């Protein structure tokens, strides 16, 4: 692996009985870049995330995660909590905040790994030792910084479930970032957002990429988001990779247009309203 290659997926196959959800998929994601995974509904995109984050164990394949200065780890061999500790963060298609907890508390909970280490796995926390108190104070400060960054600091004490939908989406990304990931996996973060909210999301993701230098894996159906912010795009159809390259090359790939529009499509440029930007 090169020094900037963060994730390498090799020959990933995921079967559910006789159904092949992912079929011999290989691609890589680079540190400091946004890699989008797109494809029609049912193409297997979320299944990839479930394999990367330990929800599923792949039938076949190697998932190599390599952070500069550390030994590579193989995600297919690891449990989900160990994958999170290794530096892989994730959001979900359906928002999974803790709705009855405050906005601030949702971001503090995301830092549980560091708080547990500071508490010697609850001993220091139980007795209120200074190391744990300092870590708890740092967690509150870090959470507050993220709330300020996404414009939700005035809502810190509000229940997360009371926030408007777009704010909940941003809060979920901030919560994932509070785990301090090296690879951030975002599953349809623009789902349900209006045009202004999508534009704000684009700016937030660019800022995360440029400020923190992490790798971002993005599953998204909103092609305006994908084409505006992605450095690299992988296209799936029925679990197989059909294209892999820059936004420009993918947009004009006949195989991609065929997957979205059908066999009879004109493969010159995607027509307006097709879901692929012209």
Enumerate the predicted regions with their spans:
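Glycine-rich phosphate-binding loops of nucleotide-dependent enzymes
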Residues: 2-278
């Amino acid at each position: 692996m090169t020094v900037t290659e963060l994730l390498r997926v090799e020959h990933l196959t995921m079967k559910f009985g006789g159904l092949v959800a992912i079929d011999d998929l290989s691609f890589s994601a680079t540190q400091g870049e946004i890699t989008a995974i797109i494809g029609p509904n049912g193409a297997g995109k979320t299944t990839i995330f479930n394999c990367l984050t330990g929800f599923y164990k792949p039938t076949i394949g190697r998932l190599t995660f390599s952070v500069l200065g550390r030994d590579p780890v193989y995600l297919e061999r690891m449990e989900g909590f160990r994958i999170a500790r290794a530096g892989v963060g994730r959001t979900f298609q359906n928002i999974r905040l803790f709705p009855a907890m405050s906005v601030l508390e949702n971001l503090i909970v995301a830092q549980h790994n560091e708080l547990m280490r500071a508490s010697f796995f609850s001993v220091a926390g139980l007795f209120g030792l200074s190391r744990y108190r300092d870590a708890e104070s740092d967690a509150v400060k870090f959470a507050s910084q993220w709330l300020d960054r996404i414009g939700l600091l005035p809502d810190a004490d509000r229940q997360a479930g009371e926030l408007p939908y777009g704010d909940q989406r941003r809060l979920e990304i901030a919560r994932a970032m509070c785990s301090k990931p090296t690879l951030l996996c975002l599953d349809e973060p623009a789902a349900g957002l209006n045009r202004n909210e999508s534009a704000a999301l684009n700016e937030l993701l660019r800022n995360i990429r440029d400020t923190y230098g992490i790798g971002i894996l993005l599953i998204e159906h909103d092609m305006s988001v994908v084409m505006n912010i992605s450095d690299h795009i992988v296209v799936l159809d029925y679990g197989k990779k059909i294209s892999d390259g820059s936004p420009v090359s993918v947009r004009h790939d006949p195989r991609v247009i065929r997957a979205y529009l059908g066999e009879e499509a004109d493969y010159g440029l995607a027509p307006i309203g097709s879901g692929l930007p012209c």
